[in-house]
């Protein structure tokens, strides 16, 4: 999965997919009442990027729905996965469940079109703080009470705080999550970060009793770092330059081993060689 980083304006969906992304990451900020409000990152952000592009969250969802609904004039067949980077650090811990409920309502109405031919992309809820694990239950309860528990088949999870792998595993246990797990590792492109924790995550993914289904690394803008991440065995790379990642995947060393994921590749299944 080539994951376009910080895609917060509707116009950027086309831009990143046209550069080679089959997945995008979108920031979601919340108001004081835990309503998802804007797709907005803010300052500071990655080097070389404009930090302040934004939409109202529900409007972004409508644009995203068009981009992922077959038959729509804006449809992109290859856009198959969306990571919502949930900026919950502005909330109190006890608001996490409410944030999940309100997020589910927004997605149900504006993205899934109340279960009637909505967008088809798989969705990852990426949570920065382990203490906010109740967001997941709130989200699930709402889809169930609104009569659409089947949409949970399209939803996965990520804790993005670079926490100890063991602590993340314990948190999923508390949250009652037993699958659909992506594990992120990374740092802003302005700084360097080694691949030690990525390798631990990959080892967990490939063990018989691990909790991880997929591992992604962020934010990668250079060819050399891309090669290092692929050599470590990641499933996804988040980038400001999808064309750079696509270029490396085309190199003979990687062409035989990796391919770009399509809609038929289940993002919740651990890939077995």
From Swiss-Prot:
One of its GO terms (biological process) is killing of cells of another organism. Its EC number is 4.6.1.-. It catalyses: an N-(acyl)-sphingosylphosphocholine = an N-(acyl)-sphingosyl-1,3-cyclic phosphate + choline; an N-(acyl)-sphingosylphosphoethanolamine = an N-(acyl)-sphingosyl-1,3-cyclic phosphate + ethanolamine; a 1-acyl-sn-glycero-3-phosphocholine = a 1-acyl-sn-glycero-2,3-cyclic phosphate + choline; a 1-acyl-sn-glycero-3-phosphoethanolamine = a 1-acyl-sn-glycero-2,3-cyclic phosphate + ethanolamine. Keywords: Cytolysis, Dermonecrotic toxin, Disulfide bond, Glycoprotein, Hemolysis, Lipid degradation, Lipid metabolism, Lyase, Magnesium, Metal-binding, Secreted, Toxin. The active site is at 5, 41 (nucleophile). Its main location: secreted. InterPro entries: PLC-like_Pdiesterase_TIM-brl (IPR017946). Mg(2+) binds at residues 25, 27, 85. Binds 1 Mg(2+) ion per subunit. Expressed by the venom gland. GO terms for molecular function: lyase activity; metal ion binding; phosphoric diester hydrolase activity; toxin activity. Its cofactor is Mg(2+). Coiled coil: none annotated. The keyword tRNA processing does not apply. It is found in: Secreted. Glycans are attached at residue 250. GO terms for cellular component: extracellular region. The keyword Transmembrane does not apply. Disulfide bonds join 45-51, 47-190. It is an enzyme of class 4 (lyase). Belongs to the arthropod phospholipase D family. Class II subfamily. Dermonecrotic toxins cleave the phosphodiester linkage between the phosphate and headgroup of certain phospholipids (sphingolipid and lysolipid substrates), forming an alcohol (often choline) and a cyclic phosphate. This toxin acts on sphingomyelin (SM). It may also act on ceramide phosphoethanolamine (CPE), lysophosphatidylcholine (LPC) and lysophosphatidylethanolamine (LPE), but not on lysophosphatidylserine (LPS), and lysophosphatidylglycerol (LPG). It acts by transphosphatidylation, releasing exclusively cyclic phosphate products as second products. This is Dermonecrotic toxin LdSicTox-alphaIB1avi.
